[in-house]
Swiss-Prot record:
Protein name: ABC transporter B family member 27
GO biological process: response to aluminum ion
PROSITE patterns reported in the protein's UniProt record: ABC_TM1F (PS50929), ABC_TRANSPORTER_1 (PS00211), ABC_TRANSPORTER_2 (PS50893)
Domain ABC transmembrane type-1 residue range list: 71-362
Residues in ABC transporter domain copies: 396-633
Subcellular location: Vacuole membrane
Entry's induction text: Not induces by aluminum treatment.
Native organism: Arabidopsis thaliana
Alphabetical list of CDD domains matching this protein: ABC_6TM_AtABCB27_like (cd18780), ABC_MTABC3_MDL1_MDL2 (cd03249)
Main subcellular localisation: membrane
Stated family: Belongs to the ABC transporter superfamily. ABCB family. Multidrug resistance exporter (TC 3.A.1.201) subfamily.
GO (cellular component) term, any one: plastid
Role: Probably involved in redistribution of internalized aluminum. May mediate vacuolar sequestration of a metal complex.
Amino acid sequence: MGNKKLLTGGSSKTHGSGSSYRDPLLQNQEDKPKANGSENGLNDLEHGVVEAANVGFGRVFALAKPDAGKLVIGTIALLIGSTTNLLVPKFGGMIIDIVSRDVKTPEQQTESLIAVRNAVVIILLIVVIGSICTALRAWLFNSASERVVARLRKDLFRHLMHQEIAFYDVTKTGELLSRLSEDTQIIKNAATTNLSEALRNVTTALIGVGFMFTSSWKLTLLALVVVPVISVAVKQFGRYLRELSHTTQAAAAVAASIAEESFGAVRTVRSFAKESYMVSQYSKKVDETLKLGLKQAVLVGLFFGGLNAAFTLSVITVVSYGAYLTIYGSMTVGALTSFILYSLTVGSSVSSLSSLYTTAMKAAGASRRVFQILDRVSSMSSSGDKCPVGNPDGDVELNDVWFAYPSRPSHMILKGISLRLTPGSKVALVGPSGGGKTTIANLIERFYDPLKGKILLNGVSLMEISHQYLHKQISIVSQEPILFNCSVEENIAYGFDGEASFTDIENAAKMANAHEFIEAFPDKYNTVVGERGLRLSGGQKQRIAIARALLTNPSVLLLDEATSALDAESEYLVQDAMDSLMAGRTVLVIAHRLSTVKTADCVAVISDGEVAEKGTHDELLSLNGIYTNLVKRQLQSSSSVTTL
């Protein structure tokens, strides 16, 4: 309704309504203790960012701690499998030495054939044992990885659900979805599957080097000359890649956020013919991600190309020197063959470790983003445990309440609001748009805490009341209610504590004037309403939301009337349902209808965060002030006198 929106309040401190006024609370904001657990305090709410966490791999691997027993068994299987794989070159070299002998007599030939057969049998046994251990290792580590990602996603989602509303004011939904899906998947691979492969390659490399020493210590030392150089290169490469990966994932999250927003607002996009614009915006962010990805690809390509060149030159050098030793009798052909096989196996393992290190650095970037949320402490405590005894009669009091949204701390919305809602009373909030009407409702619902002052329910501060108890006593019905993508029955029963009977659900729907249109659906109460209730009209969503509030039977009702978006019939049905909902309850209504204001016990006009006028409808008209002007303006803009 533009500047015709209204709000109620109580007595307030009067400091004037000029825009130049700056309240004294703002002077002390920097001195207030910061409730947020991050180093930047509430800075992440003001700027939309949280300081990235420094996450060691020990913390990532700790995610698999509940599966430690299975991973130990998997590690034992891994060690056995790695050892068996390295025994094959040893017996292969023995076969080469056997067939290289100078065999002259039939007895020697028979002896050689028996020796070869025995070696082949041993190799087959080694392969069978190694295959069984490899299968066992893969099963245990992969099953553990699935449990790791499930636990991580549950923990992350649980933590997100307990963040304060202000956190969601500044955080994009697409970014959170990216952390829940993509980042957790990367961490899953690092914590288990990649760990398995890393252990296998490390074990293979160490055991392989041991066998290389038994074959020729001279060749082994020559082969290990390149290791220090490669180690330094890998460390520097990994450090740079970790930062680049973190930046790439952040850019991808922005693109995901644009996509999520576009899908959620597809009707708005279509109504303005902005499909091409949204595609362009998404493409720009994808191109930014692509640019970073291509930079990463070039870096990885150069690194692995150099690594391959170093290994290849090392192998050529070792083989050349090995041939020299063989020619001069210091090694047998079989020993040289075994050594070459060992060196190739070790080289392959080290090369795989480099690849795994690259993946691990990407996981480190993802881990920073995930643990950044897991380490974040909500700036609002929900640890109150009081449940006021006696009749929950809905006595609400705002006492000298000051408030500024955490995302805009320099802009004070409420300036010393004091307001009393006596049990069973109906208080209408009216006033110019932006005055603070919705903010008052948000504070009573405890979506935010005031900077100064108190809000009491039945004489107890909201901050001391149990989170569950508070929201069973207070219910809110907004202009644009949000429904969940489930059945009508499930949506109505959503706020009910326990298992709601179908009879109770049906009665609530009847009181909300929703039963008739629900019964007209082919699936009746089993009808799925779609995401955010998009398959229903505005009036239908309103009435289901009213039925949901009726079923919870709150003692305090916060109501934001919605009339401008409804046709006359829907408006009548919704208003009639609201009248049923308000009966016998303490009601705070952000009023848009003249009929609502007339029947209110108290009307409060909120202007510039203060209560400018307060009284009944007739009392305020007699003042010839802001309220009178609002009524006159509405009457001039419409031939109907039913709305305000």
